[in-house]
Amino acid sequence: MKIAILATNPHLYSHKRLKAEAEAAGHEVKIINPLYCYMNVAASNPKVHYRGGAPLPHFDAVIPRIGASITYYGTAVLRHMETMGMYTLNESIAISRSRDKFRSLQLLARKGIPMPLTSFAQSPDDTEDLIHMVGGAPLVIKLLEGTQGKGVILADSHQSAVSIINAFKEMHANILVQEFIEESRGTDIRCFVIGEKVVAAVKRQAKDGEFRANVHQGGKAVKVKLSPQERAIAVSAAKTMGLRVAGVDLIRSNHGPLVLEINSSPGLEGIEKATNINLAGKIIEYIEKKAKPISSNHRFHG
């Protein structure tokens, strides 16, 4: 098979691992920077050209590893590849859906998937009511555009919540205000979903004095055993987004597991090293089983 990895940085652990496993399985692999791609829009012969002017060849499968900062352009390139009949591991519409944090929460709520109580605002006039909607302090305030734990603040008191929200109000920032689950302070669980199965899971523990468990914020990851309920919720969350491969972040509360976030380009390094599971290899095996050209009547989803 000819496989493209759509990514801006070929040196990241995840991208090197995917390339190595695909090549070890006998496939031809190219890492394609989406920012170097440009496209024509044509009814009969859509094309993607690459830096230097050469048209991209047809790939049997595309693995999108699109960073959050280039979601719009990266998914546009991916969508064009879909119109050309290329199989994409995660489809452009699913990535866009999961990157819109509030939209993803709306979809999860519609499916009855449990999550923390959340409100959404942009420069709210009534800060007090916004706080009241999620049950009061302590609460978590998140910038809608934040990733890897950045732009996430814990307000321990009512006054600090008011001050933080009012500060964001001055920036005209889109924010999520979310109830804080005290019993999960400093921990979360990353479930790695491929297809309709959780293939690996780790518990992430924040460093001392930090409530964000993200490995990028200095947290540590250790292998964890999931309950059947946690597995089912993680798979349902990924399926709701339409993602074939996803990192689903859960927390354990006194009333059961809650979904925090769904990542369409989950990192491999922390979870592979903590579990000794070859996730890159499992992704390539999944592609080998599932990759088929997209039929003409399924090439564009809007």
From Swiss-Prot:
SUPFAM superfamilies named among the record's database cross-references: Glutathione synthetase ATP-binding domain-like
Q: Name one GO cellular component term.
A: cytoplasm
Binding sites annotated in the UniProt record for Mn(2+) 1 = D249, E261
Q: Which PROSITE patterns match?
A: ATP_GRASP
Residues that, per the record, bind Mg(2+) 2: E261, N263
MF terms in GO = ATP binding; metal ion binding; ribosomal S6-glutamic acid ligase activity
Q: Which cofactor does it need?
A: Mg(2+); Mn(2+)
- Which residues hold ATP? K142, E179, F180, D188, R212, A213, N214
Asked if the keyword Nucleus belongs to this entry, the reply reads no
Q: What EC number(s) does its UniProt record assign? A: 6.3.2.-
> Where along this sequence does the record place binding of Mn(2+) 2?
E261, N263
Q: Does the keyword Plastid apply?
A: no
> GO biological process annotations for this chain's record?
protein modification process; SOS response; translation
- Coiled-coil boundaries: none
Q: How is the cofactor bound?
A: Binds 2 magnesium or manganese ions per subunit.
* Sorted UniProt keywords: ATP-binding, Ligase, Magnesium, Manganese, Metal-binding, Nucleotide-binding, Protein biosynthesis
Q: Which residues form the ATP-grasp domain?
A: 105-288
Q: Name one Pfam family in it.
A: RimK
Spell out the family assignment given in the record's similarity comment.
Belongs to the RimK family.
User: What name goes with this protein?
Assistant: Probable alpha-L-glutamate ligase
Q: Which organism is it from?
A: Legionella pneumophila subsp. pneumophila (strain Philadelphia 1 / ATCC 33152 / DSM 7513)
Q: Which gene encodes it?
A: rimK
